[in-house]
Regions:
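Right-handed parallel beta-helix
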Residues: 139-148, 169-180, 196-209, 221-243, ...
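Bacterial N-terminal signal peptides
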Residues: 38-45
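Glycine-rich beta-solenoid repeat tracts in large extracellular/virion proteins
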Residues: 132-136, 161-167, 184-185, 190-196, ...
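Acidic Gly/Asp/Thr-rich repetitive segments characteristic of extracellular carbohydrate-active
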Residues: 80-121
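Extracellular beta-rich repeat passengers
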Residues: 286-395
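Bacterial N-terminal signal peptides that target proteins for export
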Residues: 24-36
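Extracellular beta-strand-rich solenoid/capping regions of secreted or surface-exposed proteins
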Residues: 109-116, 126-141, 150-173, 180-198
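Bacterial Sec-dependent N-terminal signal peptides
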Residues: 31-33, 45-73
Length: 395
């Protein structure tokens, strides 16, 4: 037997490095061909992988211990709910249940009130004749097709509002525009209210021109995530209401009263990649009691008086947001618990306070975090009802 002296690797000069017979050369060349094919197959497998999927896997492993800073958004799966709604067993809504399609107010009201209907598809523009009560239900999704809109034209105290969610759990609201008739301080109703609801995910929606507010959360509601959602006022406010404010473009109230001490330990809410856009005056949001995480959001309402307002026993973490052309990005009110404003926030052409006070809570979840430099472009392009339907995975 001859002894062989192999170089590391196999190349076209393989037989120069070894002494071998013609048969051995044939054997080696067969091996070389198979080896090359194997390498090519492996290389093609790697290049055919979605690079986003690869980075997502790596990021998810790392995010077990820390949030990740990334420059663009990612697409995940429905089971990977971001923020507080991922806790307490998670939020799945109606899952893969059979759809009930609605195009009229009567159909929408019937589907919402029917507890056996778990997945509602809204198409077109539906104008509500009266506010709809969504009460005492579990495991339901309501979503819109492209351009779907639910509208109220009623500015009265008792007749305003679009949908009132009460005592419900495991709910998903996605890709819908909720449009009110314009702000009017009559102590009326919000476009949408969550009252004592748990595990709710509001994703890729737009709330505009609510009478009292755009979207409020109160009364022991808990484990809520609001993602890629836009808040705006496009209609001029109406003055002269019984409530006393001539401009009540107050978008989002968290906790209804300083005296609602039953809210202690609840109102755990994440606002991630949301946009408080043109027309918002105050309450972006205004918080009592809750542990609220505001991350990667964009504030650019030029008519603002104040943006984030930390009220009684509010505990707020403000992380990697962009404030642009607004007044008082952070209002510290009497009796707050803590507001942490991280170094990742960007303030451009703002006036008023930008500092926090005390040390806010640490979220028990990990969430993919955009670099502040990517927030404006990502949110202005993606926030709102920008999907074609019930498409999952904002992050």
């Amino acid at each position: 037997m001859n002894k062989f002296n192999f170089h590391v690797g196999i190349n076209k000069h393989l037989c120069i490095a070894i002494k071998c017979s013609n048969n051995q050369i044939k054997t080696i060349m067969k091996f070389k061909t198979k080896f090359a094919i194997s390498l090519f197959t492996i290389a093609m497998a790697f290049t055919s992988c979605n690079t986003e999927d690869v980075s997502e896997s790596t990021t998810e492993e790392a995010s077990l211990t820390t949030n990740q800073n990334v420059s663009t958004s990612r697409v995940g799966v429905c089971s990977e709910v971001p923020g507080w709604a991922s806790q307490n067993g998670g939020t799945t809504g109606g899952g893969t249940s059979a759809e009930t399609a609605v195009t009229t107010y009567a159909q929408l009201k019937s589907a919402i009130e029917n507890t056996s209907v778990k997945l509602i598809k809204v198409s077109g523009t539906i104008t509500v004749s009266a506010r709809i009560s969504f009460q005492n239900q579990t495991g339901k999704t309501i979503y819109g097709t492209s351009g779907a809109k639910i509208v109220s034209t009623n500015q009265t105290k008792d007749g305003s509002g679009i949908i009132y969610f009460k005592g419900s759990k495991n709910i998903i609201i996605r890709n819908l525009i909720f449009e009110g008739p314009g702000a009017y301080d009559t102590d009326g109703w919000d476009n949408v209210t969550l009252d004592n609801c748990q595990n709710v995910w509001v994703d890729h929606c737009e709330f505009r021109d609510g009478v009292d507010g755009n979207f409020d959360i109160k009364n022991k509601s808990d484990y809520i995530s609001v993602t890629y959602t836009k808040f705006t006022y496009l209609k001029a406010p109406r003055a002269g209401g019984s409530g006393g404010s001539d401009d009540h473009r107050y978008s989002n109230l968290i906790g209804s009263s300083d005296s609602a001490t039953g809210d202690r330990g609840t109102l755990r809410i994440t606002f991630a990649r949301c946009w408080w856009a043109s027309g918002c005056k105050e309450r972006m949001p205004r918080v009592r009691f809750g542990k609220v995480h505001i991350i990667n959001c964009y504030f650019n309402s030029s008519v603002s008086n104040k943006c984030i307002a930390a009220g009684f026993e509010a505990n707020i973490k403000v992380e990697n947001n962009v404030f642009e052309n607004v007044k008082t990005p952070i209002e510290l009110m009497t009796g707050l618990t803590a507001v942490t404003v991280t170094s990742g926030n960007v303030f451009t052409n703002t006036s008023g306070n930008t500092a926090g006070k005390n040390t806010a809570f640490t979220p028990p979840y990990s969430i993919v975090t955009l670099l502040a430099s990517a927030v404006k472009s990502d949110i202005s392009a993606g926030a709102g009802a920008t999907f074609a339907g019930n498409i999952c995975g904002s992050f």
